[in-house]
Amino acid sequence: VLVDGAHAPGSIAVDLAAIGADWYAANLHKWAHAPRSCGILWSRPEHQATLHHPVVSWGSGRGFHAEFEHHATCDPTSYLAAPEGMALLREWDYNAVLAYMHSLAMEAGRVLTDQWKTTLDIPKDMRGAMITVPLPEDAGATTGDATRLRLSLLVDEGIEVQLHAWRGRLWARVSAQVYNDRSDIVR
């Protein structure tokens, strides 16, 4: 079982043993305060021999860590900065930060669904610091509609939001980070 935990680290508590994954991959750039291009790839020890880096390099065939440690020519800055981002999370009351971000994301969902007259139907166990909110049906229904609206919001309003088409309507992916507050929602 491969778990794509893209936005989990720093957004929700992650317990790899409880998940029961054979492999786990995730980003660290959004919620764990690491630079872009930094992420993690974890494998159960018994599966590490089956996982190989796509770039053949000096470590090829020398084991899991050697194959993934150095590959081609790359800038290691993001890897070196990642521990600092994780240390920042440890300095804060991590549970309080998660509760704040989750609460603010749900508040954003309530504000938007009230304004758009749509409904937010997310089970409590699937709520996090990022939620997906349905736009009104007349906002569009296609990927092209999503692209046009996203660019219009960015250029005309200075708002960056991920929009996508699904099930015949547009949806907005809204994130609440520790540095956001309610004024960012109503802006």
Role assignments for model-derived ranges:
Residues 141-145, 155-187:
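PLP-dependent enzyme catalytic core of the Aspartate aminotransferase-like
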Residues 1-22:
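Catalytic PLP-binding core of fold-type I/II PLP enzymes
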Residues 99-106, 115-156:
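Conserved PLP-binding catalytic core of the aspartate aminotransferase-like
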Residues 19-59:
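Active-site PLP attachment segment
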Residues 2-4, 25, 52, 121, ...:
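Structural detector of well-ordered beta-strand residues that form the stable sheet scaffold
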Residues 54-70:
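The feature captures the short pre-catalytic strand/loop hairpin that immediately precedes
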Residues 66-110:
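Structural signature of PLP-dependent enzymes
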